[in-house]
Amino acid sequence: RLLDTRFKLGMFDSPEKSKWGHLGKKDVDSKEHRALAREVAQKSIVLLKNKDGLLPLKDKFKKILVMGPVAANVNALLGNYNGLNSHLVTMLEGIIGKTEDKADISIDYVMGVGMYGESKQRGWTLGQAENADVVVACFGLDNAMEGEEGESVETIKGDRETIELPKWQLDYLQAAKERGTPIVLVLTGGSAIAFPREIADAILMVWYQGEEGGNAVADVIFGDAIPEGHLPVTFPKSTEDLPDFADYSMKNRTYRYIEK
């Protein structure tokens, strides 16, 4: 199959015969390709919850707090085996870009908690959630936390042993929720993540969004794009709900897509 694909791509043809031979550096990272990357990212986003029509935010809220270890993290835009990119747009950058021409809307940002462990800054950063009109909480996994081989040397990295959202992230989210401000949870990852649905008022599963991810997420949050995605995998409530890994009977499991 690998060789078949290479033949179809014309990799064994002479440049003058290959229909791809005319492509060069000018065709890499073009405006058209970035626009396509943004569109694909938009359409992959899954809306899991939207209590009281919190989304889209549009211009309903004037003080927006962006928080979480994923918000300014380019690694949370990329899956494993990714290539190099000239420019990656983080979620924080996308949200700022969406509102920078609106003088009456302010954006604050706190990481709040670490990607791979507890943060000592947790206490004082939570106060900002209380003072905001709405919180956009960017949490989840990055390509190292679901990595393979070399990344698995560090204990936090490599294959996941549980499907739960990391405890330190969940604890911080819970503390932020107790402040009473509406929360839009933006989750990154490439597999099922278990978490309590009541942790946020609106929930978007955005996966690994790619180079235009921050812009695509901001488009959906502010209503310039519709989250059209569907879950390709089941999200169990907890690791305990999963059958034993050595059980190959496939009872109560199916390859079929179920609407409800």
Kindly label every feature range from the protein language model.
Residues 1-16:
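Long, well-ordered, tryptophan-enriched scaffold segments
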Residues 4, 23, 27, 35-260:
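C-terminal non-catalytic regions of proteins with extracellular/luminal or membrane-system context
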